[in-house]
């Protein structure tokens, strides 16, 4: 499994992080680490380390980008 560090922006409302976590699981990913970087003005920025099968994060990024209000800011292989 390859690991990727993702920084995402998401709405600061109940259930937003749960939706992201479910999408990561749907794409076959496993969250290895999570931290809240910023939380203000109705938006949050979170750092995640996610392990995925294979080495191409395209499916994971497509699933995350399909969630309304969620934006992948950056992605890099760990």
Regions found by a protein language model. Give the residues of each.
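A conserved regulatory-domain signal marking ACT and ACT-like small-molecule sensing domains
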Residues: 1-78
């Amino acid at each position: 499994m390859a690991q990727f560090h993702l920084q995402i922006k998401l709405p600061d409302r109940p259930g937003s992080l749960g939706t992201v976590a479910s999408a990561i699981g749907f794409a076959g990913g496993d969250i290895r680490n999570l931290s809240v970087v910023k939380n203000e003005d109705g938006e949050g920025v979170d750092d995640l380390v996610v392990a995925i099968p294979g080495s191409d994060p395209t499916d994971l990024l497509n699933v995350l980008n399909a969630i309304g209000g969620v934006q992948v800011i950056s992605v890099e292989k760990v």
